[in-house]
Amino acid sequence: KAGDFMANTPLDFLLKDSKATLIQLYVDGKTPLPTIPDHDVAIVAIGEADDSHPVLASLDAVLKTWPRPVLNRNVQAIIDLSRSVVSDLFVQSDLVIAPRTLRLSRQVLKQIATRQTALDPALSWPLLVRPVGSHAGNNLEKIADPEALTTYLSAFTHEQAYVASYVDYASADGQFRKYRIGLIGRKPYLSHLAISDHWMVHYLNAGMSDSQTKRDEEAEAMAHFDEGFALRHKAALAELCTQIDLDYFAIDCAETQDGKLLLFEADAAMIIHAMDEPDLFPYKGPQMKKLFGAFQALLEGALQPKTR
């Protein structure tokens, strides 16, 4: 669908150096589809967002009679990637820690801030509050108490927010480590590891370019991902793939202090790329080639006849 670069699955990046020809068809859920060019395989490449839900729902009937194999055919699974629904999927899980996330109106938040409404039992202070639809930490704040929430709301212009309890996931050295992982055909591939001394970790502000020590650790994590992180969390990652029934999606996650997988977000449109400076990040080229190769193999595999 039309939108910014985070609105859709980054197919241009995922098909880097492949021999595939990419035909992108933008849909809005209202305009009749044009004549579809001949193709070998299709993929639903729309990310979860409020304005995506009707578009995705409109595709369900169309895809039932699509003349070619379709990846991420389960449009309801994409719709269900909202932060609140994803947290509900794992509320009973012993393997995946997905802090319960509620979608609350500005009015309810004001009532919590003024103590007119009690905090939901699923939540506890400090809270993480972010506007619905926001990304990359925009307007995301850790709120210590009702007074801090009042201050936050004084500049809050949105109608709704996602609210979750904060989980301290600092490692023993005081650093916070956030992993971005692509789940491709139910197999995990590490896209990056960001390391920061701040709880709100984003790769671009984590100082990775400025620290050889951090880059060395990321290189080590990539080199030994399969027998390291992926093996430690094999059962948790399998549960993720079962609950989120998609051929391709990605997650941002960490490890809790007791060694469990802490899920921050799951999305089909998370940015995965190979644009980092190769002289500074020489280890990323082989890793991203492996990830992109897996995605391209997923497309090719969809063309193969299914065997019982």
Please annotate each region the language model reported.
Residues 47-50, 132-134, 269:
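Short glycine-rich anion-binding loops that position phosphate/pyrophosphate groups of nucleotides
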Residues 3-110:
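Conserved N-proximal alpha/beta basic substrate-recognition cap immediately N-terminal to
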Residues 127, 189-190, 249, 262-265:
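Protein kinase-like catalytic core scaffold
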Residues 30, 166-171, 253-254:
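Short, solvent-exposed loop/turn elements at beta->coil junctions and helix N-caps
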Residues 242-246, 255-308:
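C-terminal active-site "lid" helix and adjoining low-complexity regulatory extension at the edge
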